[in-house]
């Protein structure tokens, strides 16, 4: 099996999204992270315990630990008549992941985190959702400059 992931930060963000999505479906955090990271890296006899990259674990653990706060922030930026429950699980997960990195990862410039999550959104959602995610996260970045690193 060929590995289509190269362990770049973008690839690890995508794997974090996959793990977070699986957690929402009932998977355990570490098991979901290990599966998302290693499902295409090892097969059969080559199977081994892979060391998870800190960046991946930090994203998955951080989003999981701050989920309520992230959901509240997302809710405050939704248009009137919209609620968090109305969003698809894919969009909610992407918003949580992008917002977490923007808010808590000082080493990642806000615009980089924003652009990266949009690229993941384009792969796992449709163009309308990618634009929606871009708009909501851009609004957050522009409204809270003192709380962000831009």
Curated annotation (Swiss-Prot):
One of its GO terms (cellular component) is cytosol. The lineage of its organism: Bacteria, Bacillati, Bacillota, Bacilli, Lactobacillales. GO terms for biological process: DNA-templated transcription termination; transcription antitermination. Pfam families: NusB (PF01029). The keyword Transcription regulation applies. This is Transcription antitermination protein NusB. It comes from Streptococcus pyogenes serotype M5 (strain Manfredo). Keywords: RNA-binding, Transcription, Transcription antitermination, Transcription regulation. GO terms for molecular function: RNA binding. Involved in transcription antitermination. Required for transcription of ribosomal RNA (rRNA) genes. Binds specifically to the boxA antiterminator sequence of the ribosomal RNA (rrn) operons. Belongs to the NusB family.
């Amino acid at each position: 099996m060929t590995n289509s992931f190269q362990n770049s930060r973008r690839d690890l963000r995508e794997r974090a999204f996959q793990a977070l999505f699986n957690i929402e479906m009932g998977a355990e955090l570490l098991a979901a992270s290990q599966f998302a990271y290693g499902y295409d890296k090892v097969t059969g006899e080559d199977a081994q315990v892979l060391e998870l990259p800190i960046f991946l674990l930090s994203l998955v653990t951080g989003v999981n630990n701050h989920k309520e706060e992230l959901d509240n922030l997302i809710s405050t930026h939704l248009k009137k008549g919209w609620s968090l429950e109305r969003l698809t699980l894919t969009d909610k997960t992407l918003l949580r992941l992008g917002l977490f990195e923007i808010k808590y990862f000082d080493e990642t410039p806000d615009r980089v985190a924003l652009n990266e999550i949009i690229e993941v959104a384009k792969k796992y959602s449709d163009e309308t959702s990618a634009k929606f995610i871009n708009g909501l996260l851009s609004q957050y970045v522009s409204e809270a400059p003192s709380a962000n690193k831009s």
